[in-house]
């Protein structure tokens, strides 16, 4: 069965958990319980702020390191979910439901990509 990586994209400086409505955590918990019981969720997590991260770049035969925050970047990956679904349509539906539990005044995006399986893996 194919796996899909759902990358949560946020504008890091505009999301404040203290600004979430009172039912947000309960809605998210209920969705995570449902998706886990359905056997779809393989792994998920939020990510620490970009101020605590580093970027490594390979160029001209060398690795360069840039420490965050990355102020030039508007959107950042704020979390991920690894889903195992029967098809892309199912992955998209779970992803749509994930977005719908967020407070309406937040802007959150998802990029859903199928994981390319290596032959023999």
Residue ranges and their predicted role:
Residues 1-121:
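Conserved, structured core segments of small domains
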